[in-house]
């Protein structure tokens, strides 16, 4: 072994011999060392490319760290080898025998170096003969190219350096190394996670925002219901609507004042019917609103005579009761049709009266007239006179005064009676003794009989009620009690049922009346 002290003593000796040229080829040694560095860098770059395509970010960065460590070890080995070569050069100035031993040691070191190269380098660099041939062909340019290649970094290494730079900026190196390697896929996953978090946050809105939305929706709903009520109130049921509006006007105003509450800013908003305080109250409010709509619809149905859930006999009983009340109090029907009476029984009576006129009688009258050729003058005469008397006479071929056709006429129609109001049943004494006589045929006389009975059925029924009420009138008894007593007595006797059956016969006769044959 060569020691440093021996080196210093030999260098400071008095007798110095001229330096002999070393047998070591320094150009070859430098080329081999530079070739070693280049091969290491190429090998590391190839390994990095494979590792980046196949492995994740952690493995790629670990390989970079191992590459840096191997570089540092190679650089550290370089000065040691140079010191050994310097020792060989100094010892060559001594005896030839010692110089030969040093050169032999250096040759042994070179053999060991070649063996390590053979194990570490790929197959093309394990054979020094091929490498020498390659470098001999480029002897003039190889040193400069090697020096330049030492400072050139491949593109892949630049990407890795940027990744390491991004990872150095973070606080937690382990998490960021994983994050930096799988760039695009990890970002997509993170975006999905963030979108899921946003979707989870969307249903978790603040209570104020939800109340605002509910408030806006319910305000729109209330406005629609108001418009619907306005449209319904402006239809063809003016009389019934006047009753309901005038009777419940003050109550509705009080309810509206209770339903509305004012906030600090003075804005009015509805509380009791529309504002939802929590999510569980949605179903309750919707059910309450549905009930309110159904009750309002039922109210309109009751007020409308075209829609009723009562049977025909119930309507007829109410009509009889109304006529009995009017027999004791002649102003009852007038006030009932005027809408001044607000009680429920009065409204039911008004509905039944409309039902009798508009559903029972009027359609049959229109059907009888539409299937005939009656003159308008004859029709008006039949409607104006309440009394009808049909007499037979000697037949004659003449023109029928009802239809204007040439017929075999053998009947004379006598019309008489006072004119009356079809609603209030008040009579008019103007020309009370006037009479009208018409000569008609067989078919027209039958049509006249059915038409007159249906047209004046309610007036005839009122006259019968007046005949029943007069003997039952008591001075001290109230009208309500008297009407109740007379009505129950008439119902027990079967008089109401008898009049109802009579009406049904008239209706059936009008329905099955044969058409006039020409």
Curated annotation (Swiss-Prot):
Q: Where is this region: Disordered?
A: 1-266
* Cited InterPro entries: CCDC82 (IPR025244), DUF4211 (IPR025451)
Feature: compositional bias, Polar residues: 92-107
Signal peptide range? none
The residue ranges flagged as biased composition, category Basic and acidic residues, are 16-27, 68-89, 111-127, 215-225
* Keyword Cytoplasm applies: no
Q: Does the keyword Coiled coil apply?
A: yes
What Pfam families does the entry give?
DUF4196, DUF4211
Query: For bias kind Acidic residues, which ranges apply?
Result: 38-67, 191-201, 249-266
Residues that bear Phosphothreonine: 202
Q: Keywords assigned by UniProt?
A: Coiled coil, Phosphoprotein
- Compositional bias segments (type: Basic residues): 1-14
This chain belongs to the protein called Coiled-coil domain-containing protein 82
The gene it comes from is Ccdc82
């Amino acid at each position: 072994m060569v020691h440093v002290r021996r080196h210093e003593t030999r260098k400071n000796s008095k007798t110095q011999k001229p330096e002999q040229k070393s047998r070591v080829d320094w150009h070859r040694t430098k080329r081999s060392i530079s070739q070693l560095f280049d091969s290491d860098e190429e090998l590391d770059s190839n390994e990095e490319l494979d590792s980046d395509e196949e492995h994740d970010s952690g493995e790629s960065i670990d390989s970079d760290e191992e590459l840096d460590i191997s570089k540092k070890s190679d650089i550290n080995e370089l000065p040691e080898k140079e010191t050994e070569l310097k020792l060989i050069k100094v010892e060559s100035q001594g005896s030839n025998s010692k110089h030969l031993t040093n050169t032999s040691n250096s040759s042994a070191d070179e053999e060991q170096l070649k063996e390590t190269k053979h194990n570490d380098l790929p197959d093309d660099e394990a054979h020094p003969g091929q490498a020498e041939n390659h470098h001999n062909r480029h002897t003039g340019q190889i040193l400069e190219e090697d020096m330049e290649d030492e400072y050139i970094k491949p593109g892949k290494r630049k990407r890795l350096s940027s990744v390491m730079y991004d990872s150095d900026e973070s606080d937690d190196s382990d998490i960021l190394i994983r994050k930096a390697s799988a760039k695009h896929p990890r970002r997509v996953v993170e975006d999905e996670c963030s979108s899921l978090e946003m979707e989870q946050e969307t249903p978790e809105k603040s209570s104020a925002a939800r109340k605002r939305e509910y408030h806006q929706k319910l305000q729109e709903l209330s406005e629609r219901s108001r418009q619907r009520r306005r449209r319904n109130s402006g239809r063809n049921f003016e009389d019934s609507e006047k009753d309901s509006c005038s009777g419940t006007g003050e109550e509705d105003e009080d309810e509206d004042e209770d339903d509305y509450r004012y906030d600090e800013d003075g804005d009015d908003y509805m509380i009791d019917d529309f504002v939802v305080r929590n999510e569980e109250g949605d179903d309750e409010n919707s059910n309450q609103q549905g009930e309110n709509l159904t009750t309002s619809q039922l109210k309109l149905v009751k007020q409308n005579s075209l829609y009723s859930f009562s049977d025909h006999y119930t309507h007829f009983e109410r009509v009889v009761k109304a006529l009995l009340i009017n027999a004791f109090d002649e102003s009852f029907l007038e006030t009932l049709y005027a809408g001044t009476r607000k009680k429920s029984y009065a409204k039911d009576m008004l509905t039944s009266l409309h039902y009798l006129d508009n559903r029972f009688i009027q359609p049959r009258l229109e059907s009888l007239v539409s299937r005939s050729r009656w003159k308008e003058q004859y029709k008006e005469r039949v409607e104006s006179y309440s009394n009808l008397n049909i007499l037979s006479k000697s037949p004659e071929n003449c023109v029928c005064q009802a239809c204007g056709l040439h017929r075999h006429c053998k009947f004379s129609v006598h019309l008489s009676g006072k004119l009356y109001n079809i609603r209030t049943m008040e009579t008019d004494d103007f020309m009370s003794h006037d009479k009208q006589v018409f000569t008609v045929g067989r078919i027209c006389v039958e049509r006249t009989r059915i038409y007159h009975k249906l047209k004046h059925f309610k007036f005839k029924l009122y006259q019968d009620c007046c005949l029943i009420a007069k003997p039952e009138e008591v001075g001290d008894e109230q009208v309500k009690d008297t009407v109740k007593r007379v009505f129950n007595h008439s119902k027990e006797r079967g008089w109401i049922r008898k009049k109802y059956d009579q009406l049904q016969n008239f209706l059936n006769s009008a329905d099955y009346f044969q058409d006039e044959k020409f």
